[in-house]
Design a protein with these regions (language model features):
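Conserved small/polar residues in nucleotide/adenosyl-binding loops
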Residues: 1-5, 479-480
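M16/MPP (pitrilysin/insulinase) zinc-metallopeptidase core fold and M16-derived inactive scaffolds
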Residues: 3-68, 119, 136-142, 257-291
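M16/insulysin-pitrilysin zinc metalloprotease superfamily fold
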Residues: 26, 68-102, 266, 284-344, ...
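Acidic/histidine-enriched alpha-helical segments
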Residues: 35-41, 93-111, 122, 176, ...
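Non-catalytic, conformational "gating/processing" segments within enzyme and secreted inhibitor domains
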Residues: 103, 117, 154-185, 401-403
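Hydrophobic, small-residue-rich alpha-helical packing segments that form membrane-like cores
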Residues: 103, 119, 123-125, 136-137, ...
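Proteolytic maturation boundary segments
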Residues: 176-264, 268-270, 329-333, 337-340, ...
Length: 481
């Protein structure tokens, strides 16, 4: 794992993603030429399939490589996989001819990904991140850079950012952990930390008092989609490994869960205001240095105004009046049941689940105390957190500033969308929406409130064809045994 795509300069746009490709095109121990097999063919001879068990991805802030389904009973294969990790870390060949060959591969990837929605998202960045490094940072990069960068540029980028202090290794499987750690130290002993390394900068995202609004259309987009963000300060890494952080995450989970239940209820009405809607909380679009409470909706072509107003109304209703005790009881019970299930199934946890947790710990400092501790904590914590705590948090999520709206839809003659001014006016009206508290109409009563009295068998008939017996009861029910 490596932290860095956002660190590209304008003349390097796309090099982090390009470098990810090059990691499979020849390394010190897997040259992929007449002297030896490359990583992909070697792995596939061992049952490690490219794309399924051997892969990588590059996002704005990190590149993650993955090797899975390694036969741990074959120590030679395990040792060779450690060499692959070593080579990715510091020994990718970056040969001229391989770089030129990969330019064509990435051009084709760029063409295949260049959908209407991606074009809109790329164009929206400048509005969503004004005067920010994030304003132009899609991992695929600039096709002009991909076509023309000098060979030395990617070698310099590799040397600058692929280094031990920015790298992490996660290994999970049927192994001896101490022996594996010793092997890693031996394999990686020649990977040296650079002298005077470049600073790894984490770029902030500024607050905004007035809404940031982007409206984008494209002929390839089929239906409108609405994304509304309420930006929040990101939780400092230093506060994540605390009981307070767990409590906040639990309360946040409850708020999102209950709001989504309300939105889902609206979607199931006879004439729903949207085709789909949801609420969430996480990183603000592409940036890790800012978080956001988000509302999303998909609508019919002529239903943008109604969909947008409805999700804002439901967020405002939750902010103003909160959630009911019965809603919270259900959400809490479902959450605790899910935790209990995870705890009971803990011995069946797949390696990939552990890997995901450890990767999140390395990249985002998410705590990893284990399901035993988390289950114990939830049992102690959840019953003692009242719905009022959730309602107080909801008031903080829906803010009057730091609002961002991304509206995307099809480009069709005669199709009209709300203007930026109209959207801004709607946002300002939120606090004065004419709303009533939510009524929880879900009954906790049993389906049948009266005791059911037993009936009598009034007739009995044998079925010689199937060898069964048909019974008719006094309440007219037919039973076949």
């Amino acid at each position: 794992m490596y932290k860095r795509q956002i660190l590209e300069e304008p003349q390097q746009r796309g090099l982090a993603h390009f470098l990810e490709h090059m990691a499979f095109n020849g390394t010190k121990h897997f040259p992929g030429d007449e002297t030896g097999l490359g990583i992909i063919p070697w792995c596939e001879t061992k049952g490690i399939k490219f794309g399924t068990n051997l892969n990588a991805y590059t996002s704005v802030d990190q590149t993650v490589y993955n090797i899975s389904n390694v036969p741990t009973e074959n120590q030679n294969v395990v040792d060779s996989c450690l060499l692959i990790l070593h080579d990715w870390s510091s020994a990718i060949n970056l040969a001229d001819k391989e770089i030129d060959k990969e330019r064509g591969v990435i051009r084709e990837e760029w063409r295949s990904r260049n959908s209407g929605m991606l074009r809109i998202m790329t164009d929206a960045q400048a509005t969503m991140y004004p005067d920010s490094k994030y304003a132009d940072c899609m991992p695929i990069g600039s096709i002009d850079v991909i076509n023309n960068f000098p060979y030395q540029d990617i070698r310099d980028y590799y040397a600058k950012w692929y280094r031990p202090d920015l790298q992490g290794i996660v290994i999970v499987g049927d192994i001896n952990a101490e022996e594996m750690e010793a092997k890693l130290k031996e394999v990686f002993k020649d990977v040296k930390a650079p002298v005077n390394p470049a600073e790894r900068i984490y770029y902030p995202v500024a607050d905004n008092q007035e809404p940031l609004i982007y409206i984008g259309t494209d002929k390839e987009v089929a239906n409108p989609s609405i994304n509304i963000f309420f930006k929040q300060d990101a939780t400092p890494d230093s506060l994540k490994n605390t009981i307070s952080y767990y409590a906040t995450q639990y309360v946040l989970n409850m708020a999102i869960n209950m709001l989504n239940s309300r939105l889902n209820e609206l979607r199931q009405t006879a004439n729903p205001p949207f085709t789909g809607a949801g609420a969430g909380y996480g990183e603000y679009f592409l940036a890790k240095t800012k978080e956001a409470f988000s509302l999303t909706a998909n609508s019919k072509i002529d239903g943008v105004d109604l969909a947008m107003k409805t999700i804002l109304e439901e967020a405002e209703r939750a902010r103003r009046f909160g959630f009911t005790e019965t809603e919270y009881e259900r959400a809490r019970a479902n959450y605790m049941q899910a935790m209990e299930s995870a705890y009971n199934e803990r011995e069946k946890t797949k390696s990939g689940n552990y890997v995901d947790e450890y990767v999140n710990n390395f990249l985002d400092k998410e705590p990893i105390p284990g399901i035993e501790f988390e289950y114990m904590l939830v049992q102690q914590m959840a019953p003692n957190i009242p719905v009022t705590a959730v309602n107080e948090l909801m008031k903080q999520l829906v803010t009057d500033n730091n609002q961002v709206v991304l509206l995307a839809g099809p480009q069709k003659e005669g199709l009209k969308y709300p203007t930026k001014e109209e959207i801004a006016a709607l946002l300002k009206q939120m606090s004065s929406f004419d709303l009533k508290p939510y009524e929880d109409k879900v009954s906790n009563e049993p389906l049948i409130s009266e005791d059911i009295k037993g009936g009598k068998i009034v007739s009995e008939k044998a079925d010689d064809v199937y060898g069964s017996t048909k019974l008719v009861l006094s309440n007219c029910l037919l039973y076949t045994s």
